[in-house]
Amino acid sequence: MDDSREWIRIGAAAQRAGMSVKTVRFYSDEGLIPTAGRTEGGYRLYHQQVVEELHLIQNLRGLGLALSTIRSYLAAKRQGACHCEQLKQSMREQQQAIHQKVAALQNLQQELNETMQGWVNCGGRLDAKLV
């Protein structure tokens, strides 16, 4: 480690990224971010640049992308390769999955509306048909 000012402990990385130490440790254990080593006290050390990667991971997770997709993208990015097309394809697949979920929720909403409409004249009877 050439310059100690470039390396930060896990707590500092977590704080700068706005996430818990547990989350940073998880991402590290899952191979999403590289660990530079450990202090004499056993704390994990990271390059300051990892904070940017943690923000990126957080954003991509927020879009619903799988950790495996994010891991592949970050590995390629670190090697200077562009996997934008692969990432865009994953995002298109996520869009399709969201579209299907929205359609299913709209169907459920319609079923709820129809069921409640059937109760308009139930008169508070316990024997009213529920479905």
Q: Where do the PLM segments sit?
A:
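C-terminal regulatory/oligomerization modules of transcriptional regulators
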Residues: 1-4, 81-131
